[in-house]
Each structure stands twice: as C-alpha cells, then as structure tokens.
Amino acid sequence: METNTLLSFENLIDAVGGSLIGSKSSNFCFSSAAIDSRKCVKNSLFVPLIGSVQNGHIYIRQALESGASVVFVANSELSENKANFENLAKEFNATFIAVENTMTALQKAAKRYVEQFPSLIKIGVTGSSGKTTTKEIIASVLSQKYSVVTNEGNLNSETGLPLSVFKIRAEHEVGIFEVGMNRRGEIS
C-alpha cells in the first residue's frame, strides 16, 4: 500500500468501479475524505456531489488548492470537461478517478476501508430520536476499557457516515456509529 494512504490506488479503483482520468499521481495518497472543498486538507480525497442546486465539480480547483490529492469525477461530467480534468490532474499532480456516481463511490470506498478492520467491533445506533446521546453514552462507557472511534456529532447521513468511517485506525477496537435516515428504506 502507498505510504500513509487509507486505500491503495488499486483497492480504491476496484472498490468504486472507477477508471483513471489521465495519469496516476506519482505520490498517490489520501489520508482523509471531504465533500466540501473548504474542508480539504493535504492528501484529501475530494468527492464532489451533484445536488438539486449545486454541482460540487465546480469546486475541484478549490479542493486541489486546499490540498486534495485524489478526486472522484462523475461520468456525466466527463463529456464536456475531460480535458480540463486531465489538465488539473497534471497541474496539481493529483489522481482523478471517473465513477458512475460520486455519492455511491464514496459509500463503496468507505465500505472497502472498513473491511480492512475485521477485528473491529462495530456498533450501529439507529432510532427516531436520541441517537447521538445514546452513541455518546455507549462510547463513554466502552472507552473505559477499549480504544473507541465514533462519528463526530450527528454525522449520520448517507454522506456523513462514510466520511466518519475514514477516521478508523488500526489502534481502534470498537467503532460506534450513529445511522440516521431521511426516507423510507434508506437503512437496510
């Protein structure tokens, strides 16, 4: 695996079913993930989401300027912008990966990352109300004996949870994750 990276290039490409745009960076590495370009730091994976109002792809340059080193790009953005993405990859020595859907790719990458920790005890907290408090109480009790990782605050959504699992490290013994939903059938 590349030094200090959460997933190797090959593992990431395989997990997300992606393809390389341009060339792989000579120093491929990502040690965190972000969906907000303003939250990118050195060696971040930037995942630009496409919403009903905004398209995160317009913030790729800002993410790279903030330190992002790996970028997912939705296939739907490639036809008009492939040359631009290739130029940005060269300019910033970054790795760009084309994926069908950036949200789904984030979730698949997070799933693959968690699979690297088979001995991690995983606890999911769901419910109508009180999830964050319950998660914090469980974490407080278990942290007396174990090294515990949790999602921060109430980052429990379809984007927040995948971003949170990238905080798991080898020293963690227990992961306690709050899982929220905003539509029927979202948790399965």
Q: What does each model-found stretch correspond to?
A:
Residues 98, 103-188:
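Phosphate-binding loop of NTP-binding sites
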Residues 1-108:
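N-terminal leader/targeting and accessory segments in enzymes
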